[in-house]
């Protein structure tokens, strides 16, 4: 089964919501936790308890674990494994991008079932060339895992690069979406969602066209950054059933109380229902 189909199945019962686990320093402090490995572990375990049984897709931000070295990665491994064991899909927000054997190494780290960091999906950067990512696409195809390619991100600095156009007037972000769509096309022809998704900001005024993508759309910018459910639907259009807004700040702000975080998830997810699956 493709990652896209797994995600649609999860959304049918849990809604189309992606919740981030972002244990940055100020959030650890606001939770009353020490800014060290112990605080990281406690934060992560609370998030697992709040999200594992309620959210379709959870997105740990790898950088906040990586900063603590091997001990941080050990906590990330535990977090990913526990979430997946409890039926939650996990996208590791690693934003990896390289070429050749190095990209193959990143692909194995995040998508190979034998890896201790094995996740359902990973975020990647295409700016060494879209097909520099072929090793991760190939491993995703082999194991039914997902890849989210940065296409049109929500940070304002991105516009000067991602909105640039080629000689035919096609923006870089649109070219990325179109190349992802080409990889998903065989599945879309069968009425299925493919393995290759894109990252599209929910606050963009001129987003790329997504009507032929045929894969999942990860949409940061909802909630604290100002994006709304109507923004998600307008940008995603015919692909709205595959649009998964990423909400982190507003939900994590209700922690460390697990019940409060669960309530926040439920309220937010109500704006992004899934669709029944036959």
Curated annotation (Swiss-Prot):
GO biological process, alphabetically ordered: 'de novo' pyrimidine nucleobase biosynthetic process; 'de novo' UMP biosynthetic process
PROSITE patterns for this protein: OMPDECASE (PS00156)
Pathway involvement of the protein, from the record: Pyrimidine metabolism; UMP biosynthesis via de novo pathway; UMP from orotate: step 2/2
Keyword presence, Lyase: yes
Catalytic activity, EC: 4.1.1.23
Keyword Lyase: yes
Entry's Gene Ontology molecular function annotations: orotidine-5'-phosphate decarboxylase activity
Short name of any one Pfam family annotated for the protein: OMPdecase
Key words of the record: Decarboxylase, Lyase, Pyrimidine biosynthesis
Gene3D superfamilies (UniProt xref): Aldolase class I
InterPro entries: Aldolase_TIM (IPR013785), OMPdecase_AS (IPR018089), OMPdecase_type-2 (IPR011995), OMPdeCOase_dom (IPR001754), RibuloseP-bd_barrel (IPR011060)
Residues annotated as catalytic: 95 (proton donor)
SMART domains: OMPdecase
Catalytic reaction equation(s): orotidine 5'-phosphate + H(+) = UMP + CO2
Family membership: Belongs to the OMP decarboxylase family. Type 2 subfamily.
NCBIfam families per the UniProt record, alphabetical: pyrF_sub2
HAMAP family: OMPdecase_type2
Protein name per its UniProtKB record: Orotidine 5'-phosphate decarboxylase
Gene source species: Corynebacterium glutamicum (strain R)
Gene, per the UniProt record: pyrF
């Amino acid at each position: 089964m493709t990652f896209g189909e797994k995600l649609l199945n999860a959304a049918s019962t849990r809604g189309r919501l992606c919740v981030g686990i972002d244990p940055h320093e100020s959030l650890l402090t606001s939770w009353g936790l020490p800014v060290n490995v112990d605080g990281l572990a406690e934060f992560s375990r609370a998030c697992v308890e709040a999200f594992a049984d309620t959210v379709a897709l959870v997105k740990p931000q790898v950088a906040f674990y990586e900063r603590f070295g091997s001990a941080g990665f050990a906590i990330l491994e535990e977090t990913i494994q526990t979430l997946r064991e409890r039926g939650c899909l996990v996208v590791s927000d690693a934003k990896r991008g390289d070429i050749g054997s190095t990209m193959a190494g990143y692909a194995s780290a995040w998508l190979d079932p034998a890896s201790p960091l094995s996740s359902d999906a990973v975020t990647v950067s295409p700016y060494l060339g879209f097909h520099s990512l072929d090793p991760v696409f190939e491993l995703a195809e082999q194991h039914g895992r997902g890849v989210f390619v940065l296409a049109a991100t929500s940070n304002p600095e991105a516009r000067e690069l991602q909105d640039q156009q080629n000689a035919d007037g096609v923006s870089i972000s649109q070219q990325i979406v179109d190349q992802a769509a080409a990889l998903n096309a065989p599945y879309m022809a069968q009425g299925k969602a493919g393995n290759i998704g894109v990252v599209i900001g929910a606050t963009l005024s001129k987003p790329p066209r997504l009507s032929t993508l045929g894969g999942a759309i990860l949409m940061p910018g909802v909630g604290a950054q100002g994006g709304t459910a109507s923004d998600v639907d307008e940008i995603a259009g015919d692909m709205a059933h595959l649009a998964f807004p990423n909400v982190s700040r507003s939900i994590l702000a209700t922690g460390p109380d697990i019940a409060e975080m669960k309530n926040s998830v439920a309220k937010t997810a109500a704006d992004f229902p899934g669709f029944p699956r036959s």
